Amino acid sequence: MLVMAKGLASGLPLSGIAARRELMERWVPGSHGGTYGGNAVACAAAVATIRAIREEGLLENAQRMGARLMESLQALQNEFPVVGDVRGLGLMVVSEFTAPDGSPATDLAKAVVKGCLKRHLMLLTCGPWDNTIR
């Protein structure tokens, strides 16, 4: 099952669910829904968004560039033990910062984000301890 929203209609309020037919047919009509019910403008925006993703090869580009990013971040991980983990899919990649004892290195992650911003690279911390950068 794939649940999608936000970028589906390039910022307009729309969400969708995709799954195998046999799974979708188990739901009683009207038993599922949400606050992003499709209107004509949002649906047209979603069609245009999906068309642009396909025609411009955005998924392939995200895979290619994401692999390069992962490679670079893994090289940094090998050089700097404070990078405890590097993970992701496509261009949604994170680096998790950990202290030598394995605890979350929140202050370090925030300092890295601040240093990157000074170099005009906008990143953000995330995760339950704010020690992960994406």
Give the predicted meaning of each segment:
Residues 1-134:
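Conserved N-terminal phosphate-binding loop of PLP-dependent enzymes in the Aspartate aminotransferase
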